[in-house]
Regions:
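Conserved glycosyltransferase catalytic-site signature
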Residues: 10, 102-103
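Short, well-structured N-terminal submotif of metal-dependent ribonuclease cores
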Residues: 1-42, 57-64, 140-146, 150-153
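Acidic catalytic patch
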Residues: 44-48, 74-95
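Active-site-proximal, substrate-binding regions of enzyme catalytic domains
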Residues: 49-77
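Acidic, metal-binding active-site segment of PIN/NYN-like and related structure-specific nucleases
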Residues: 103-145
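Amphipathic alpha-helical interaction segments
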Residues: 45, 49, 67, 88, ...
Length: 153
């Protein structure tokens, strides 16, 4: 079964490289590895948030983190915000549905036909526009994303 397009939030990227994160590291590593053969996109925002978090918490040097971000940019399609996504984000914010940062992330995903955001920072199961938030650390994934955690290779 072909999965629908999804994206990884900065925290999933963080846990994928932070070996001290225990079970979250194991889950995020599996998701990251399996996302390579799936319809996964990354946002410019998630990459910059990852860089800021991983270097602020001194888990990597700026040079190491930059190398990793550049590597991901060569592997995954990376979607930047645009004037149109900012307008869509402002609509979400003014209706009280999200912060400007979450709204910008969601608007970028929505503009790129992305149906799921894997993140632990937003309420799992909630839907902002066409994007469903999924926390992979809270149990099961939607059917379209089950292959990311299944035992099947």
């Amino acid at each position: 079964m072909k999965s629908e397009r999804f994206s990884l939030d900065a925290n999933i990227l963080f846990y994928a490289v932070d070996r001290a994160s225990g079970q979250k590291h194991a889950i995020a590593t599996r998701i990251a590895a399996r996302s390579l053969d799936a319809d996964c996109i990354l946002t410019l925002q998630a990459l910059t948030e990852f860089f800021a978090a991983i270097t602020r918490k001194k888990k990597m040097s700026a040079s190491e983190a930059a190398h990793l971000v550049r590597n991901w940019m060569s592997i995954y399609p990376v979607v930047p915000p645009t004037e149109g996504t900012l307008n869509a984000a402002l609509q979400l914010v003014t209706t009280g549905r999200a912060s400007i940062w979450d709204a910008t992330l969601i608007a970028c995903l929505q503009a790129n036909d992305c149906h799921y955001l894997l993140s632990e920072d937003m309420r799992t199961g909630s839907r902002l526009g066409e994007v469903e938030i999924v926390n992979p650390f809270m149990g099961s994934l939607p059917r379209a994303l089950e292959h990311l955690l299944s035992d099947d290779e």
